[in-house]
């Protein structure tokens, strides 16, 4: 036990030091970049002041002298602006990386508030998400989630809500997570790249337009001719006017004609533009994220498959998407002064719209494959980071036959290491139920959630908080905190009955379930509750089910005598020593001997 604790401590200290070193180094680097940016700003101000002074001093000189002075000061000013932009981008990246590692350090101390817990995903209708606190503040999802795309978040949440039941798929996912666990710099670069320009839930709908919108300009031969003809005529007009072969009035007339032609198809261009105008930045970000993936050589089958999905006839998906972002960016300038002028002289808007439609025709069908792969990788990065942050966790073995869940020293991932009491579990066949009895606050509910959360992690391919674990991936169903529903006019008791009926129906349909129940039939009197609980347990055993039931009703413990090969009793005791109540939170065999309600009432001065 001591050697195990020392191993965990040494592993966690290494992770703490890793993140702390990055925070220190990158905070210092960000400070240095801020100083450089401030210096560049000061130099630019000096250049402006110098230009004004020199123009004032040489104001009586020839215009060529003034033009030379302007060029002399403007060129370094522009160069400094470019340098400033690059330094500012580096500063933002550096600060974001330092901030990520600060948040990871907080996460190691169980403060996950910087990360999205997806509270909107929590649902009482779901088989287990509400009972196990999967979503929301200080939830399992919040502790794991490091996704930077809306699609990736949806993918990861989907894995939590629909864990795998296929052994081969779980092992394939384990292999991918193991590999990504070691790609720490890649995961961090991926996260920071995405978080600098975060998307939102509308991105997926916008991106779907890439393959759904029909072309309206690219098949029009007249416009394809005009985008070549108008610029050519302008070149001839310019040469003619320069050589005095044409009067300036001709240029004026052609300017008016070009203006009319340029905006003759404004409605069609608006149709193309409006479907894409908000996508420039998000596509630029997606291009950079995909580039992160393309630059690696993965060994695991799952990650190699994701990598291969970005291949596209000798080109990289990132460069193709970046080109689209550039086309959209160019069209986004159509209402600027330069954009209007270029449109009149070159039909730039029409040219860009045709390029966009051509891109969609050539690559529109590829986008679904690319962005699905990006979402997968985003979700895997979260699980890889989770594995990296918990070096003491293990990957469970996956059993072939229903049902088995056998583990040593299971702990809840959200309980602090210094207070987390770990317990074992042993279910080796079907049907089999563990009946857990015990006093209030003795640890029954925490144990149920510990088992449920680790079972879920194992079924999504992630490492689990245990010394060892073997499990069979069945569908998990829980009933731990059924509540009243005013909206549907449902009582607590009826809501619980519906839950239990759903479990029985699924079992009778042949579905393999892992069932976790806490204090069933709480909404009725003790005699009725006992009778109903006994009947339910017998029905669950008859349907070859497996699971765990926690209860205060000691009579349920008598079922072990009737079903010695299907039911096993365990207990959490409340020990009274020197007139004080203590809890060991250790699982023991047998039926609970001590209850604490009357003792606590007496301690609080309530007559019993």
PLM region spans:
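Short, Lys/Arg-enriched N-terminal segments with co-localized hydrophobic residues
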Residues: 1-11
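ATPase nucleotide-binding head domains, primarily ABC-like/P-loop NTPase cores
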Residues: 80-81, 262, 383, 389-608
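Alpha-helical coupling/stalk and coiled-coil linker elements that connect catalytic or binding modules
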Residues: 9-439, 446-476, 498-499
């Amino acid at each position: 036990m001591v050697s195990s604790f020392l191993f965990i401590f040494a592993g966690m200290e290494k992770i703490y030091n890793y993140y702390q070193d990055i925070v220190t180094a990158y905070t210092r680097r960000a400070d240095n970049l801020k100083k450089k940016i401030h210096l560049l700003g000061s130099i630019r101000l000096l250049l402006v002041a110098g230009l004004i002074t020199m123009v004032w001093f040489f104001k009586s000189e020839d215009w060529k002298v003034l033009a030379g002075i302007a060029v002399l000061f403007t060129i370094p000013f522009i160069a400094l602006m470019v340098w400033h932009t690059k330094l500012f981008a580096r500063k933002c990246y550096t600060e974001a990386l330092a901030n990520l590692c600060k948040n990871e350090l907080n996460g190691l101390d169980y403060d996950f508030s910087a990360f999205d817990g997806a509270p909107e995903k929590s649902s009482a209708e779901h088989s287990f998400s509400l009972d196990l606190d999967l979503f929301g503040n200080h939830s399992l999802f919040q502790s794991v989630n490091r996704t930077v795309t809306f699609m990736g978040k949806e993918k990861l949440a989907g894995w939590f809500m629909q864990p795998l039941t296929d052994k081969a798929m779980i092992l394939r996912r384990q292999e991918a997570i193991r590999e990504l666990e070691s790609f720490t710099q890649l995961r961090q670069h991926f996260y920071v790249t995405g978080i600098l320009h975060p998307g939102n839930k509308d991105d997926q709908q916008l991106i779907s337009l890439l393959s759904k919108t029909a072309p309206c300009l690219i098949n029009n031969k007249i416009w394809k001719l005009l985008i070549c003809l108008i610029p050519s005529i302008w070149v001839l007009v310019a040469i003619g006017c320069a050589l005095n072969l044409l009067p300036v009035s001709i240029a004026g007339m052609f300017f008016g004609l070009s203006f009319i032609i340029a905006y003759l198809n404004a409605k069609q261009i608006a149709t193309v533009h409006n479907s894409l105008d908000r996508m420039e930045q998000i596509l630029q970000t997606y291009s950079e994220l995909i580039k992160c993936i393309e630059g690696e050589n993965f060994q695991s089958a799952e990650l190699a498959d994701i990598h291969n999905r970005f291949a596209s006839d000798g080109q990289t998906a990132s460069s193709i998407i970046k080109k689209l972002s550039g086309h959209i960016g160019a069209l986004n300038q159509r209402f600027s002064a330069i954009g209007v002028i270029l449109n009149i002289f070159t039909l730039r808007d029409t040219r860009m719209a045709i390029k966009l439609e051509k891109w969609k025709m050539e690559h529109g069908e590829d986008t679904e494959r690319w962005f699905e792969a990006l979402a997968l990788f985003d979700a895997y990065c979260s699980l890889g980071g989770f594995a990296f942050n918990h070096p003491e966790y293990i990957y469970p073995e996956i059993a072939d036959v229903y049902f088995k869940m056998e583990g040593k020293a299971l702990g809840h991932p959200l309980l602090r290491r210094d207070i987390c009491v770990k317990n074992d579990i042993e279910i080796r066949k079907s049907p089999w139920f563990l009946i857990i009895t015990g006093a209030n606050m003795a640890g029954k509910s925490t144990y149920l959630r510990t088992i449920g959360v680790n079972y879920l992690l194992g079924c999504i391919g992630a490492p689990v908080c245990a010394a060892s674990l073997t499990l069979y991936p069945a569908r998990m169903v829980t009933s731990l905190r059924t509540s009243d529903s005013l909206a549907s006019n449902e009582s607590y008791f009826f809501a619980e009955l519906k839950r239990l009926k759903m479990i029985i129906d699924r079992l009778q349909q042949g579905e393999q379930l892992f069932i976790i129940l806490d204090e069933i039939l709480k909404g009725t009197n003790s005699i009725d509750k006992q009778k109903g609980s006994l009947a339910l347990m017998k029905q669950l055993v008859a349907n070859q089910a497996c699971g765990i039931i926690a209860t205060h009703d000691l009579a349920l413990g008598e079922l072990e005598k009737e079903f010695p090969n299907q039911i096993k009793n365990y207990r959490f005791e409340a020990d009274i020593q020197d007139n004080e109540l203590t809890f060991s939170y250790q699982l023991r065999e047998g039926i609970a001997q001590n209850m604490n309600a009357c003792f606590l009432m007496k301690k609080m001065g309530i007559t019993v």
